[in-house]
Amino acid sequence: MTGEGAARADIAWPPGDGRRALDPAFLLVLTHGSGGGPGSADLLAVRDAALPLGAAVALVTQPYRVKGRRAPGSPDRQDAAWIEIVDAVRDAAGPDLPLVQGGRSNGARVACRTARATGARAVLALAFPLHPPGHPEKSRAAELALAGTDVLVINGSRDPFGIPDQAARTRVVVLDGETHALSKKPETAGATAGAWLAGLPGLVHP
């Protein structure tokens, strides 16, 4: 429960020996875009790439979507609810686990804006919506900088919401032919995210 109402988090655990899951090496918390849900192909592909690395992966449905609304409302209230959600997921998965958080589209924005508050080691931003379609002057690039940590952006070359520029701690990967949905070859997004996670210092058990 958050100040905005109930959220839902489905946690998948790293595969074990057939009897029980392995103790996770890190926690990956992911969420959806404005009107979507956590079952999008790109989010599932990232989950499937992260589990063999030893991640516990939480797919989060935010309170406004649990209520059936499509618009997230105030960013401040959305961010406050997200911080509460991450705290609860960490309690369930292991409060001392290194945290990586992320999402697609609007969820990527939330993950960037709250990374400092949650203590995230890194942020994964799928289909980061740099600006509203047709309005490049309304840039949201500053939200990427708010993360204050390593960020991986995975966007499609045909995304009408634009593509961010590389920055000191922001790596941008552009998938040729993909739109904002990243649904043409979601396994490519998953593999890209998995390789990045595997390369983050101290995150994956040797």
Residue ranges of predicted features:
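Active-site nucleophile loop of the alpha/beta-hydrolase fold
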Residues: 62-63, 125-133, 156-158
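Short beta-strand/loop motif that positions the catalytic acidic residue
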Residues: 146-148, 153-155, 159
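Serine-hydrolase catalytic machinery in alpha/beta-hydrolase-like enzymes
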Residues: 1-98, 110
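Catalytic histidine-centered segment of alpha/beta-hydrolase-like enzymes
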Residues: 178-191
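Hydrolases whose catalytic domains are alpha/beta-hydrolase-1, hotdog thioesterase
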Residues: 110-114, 134
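Gly/Ala-rich beta-loop-alpha elbow adjacent to hydrolase catalytic centers
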Residues: 103-111
